[in-house]
């Protein structure tokens, strides 16, 4: 018979369970999750990267994760790159209607300095991480290692030409945990391409890597459908 008092109360994004507060000697000790020093359990923080194509509910998962941590009484620092202004400079908004205020971080900002100069939080959640600079990703890695604060990053893997974003590339190199958030193409296959569509419904194959203005839209497509649309100059239904 299971002991209800010892049941986990939440499943965190990293796959670990959060248990009710108890004496350190009574806490479980999962392999690789922490270390014992005397009578204290010190949980070792990790850097998580959850990536997916457009429309895979990355922002929704980021905001739901924030809610879950706060429901447990934990303090969350919610951040996004300042270059992402689609929904407002300091707002994270999901397609399902969830939205939250977030700190917009400019590319020249030092995330270590920002974090260490504010009231300490229990976790950092970062959305649209593909737009962070590689140096800022390294700063998040430093906060995990030196300040023992978990960092959960959400973002795209590749741009509209299937090339890695610099921030995402660095996350693939230094993250402890990497998880794909899957979505599907209109044909039903797995979508991996973030296709850029112009005002006439044509797939764009040239331009700046980061372009958030104008009449262009983005949709998730499988590689086969994307290549066919490019080759045959097919019109794609815009979202």
What are these regions (language model features)?
Residues 27, 35-40:
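Short, positively charged and aromatic/hydrophobic N-terminal segments
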Residues 42-115, 159-170, 180-183, 212-238:
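Conserved P-loop
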Residues 5-23, 29-32:
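Positively charged N-terminal leader segments that act as targeting/secretion signals
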Residues 128:
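Walker B catalytic acidic pair
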Residues 144-166:
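Sensor-1/coupling segment of RecA-like P-loop NTPase cores
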Residues 197-203, 232-239:
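Short cysteine/histidine-rich zinc-coordinating motifs and their immediately flanking basic loops
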Residues 131-132:
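Residues immediately C-terminal
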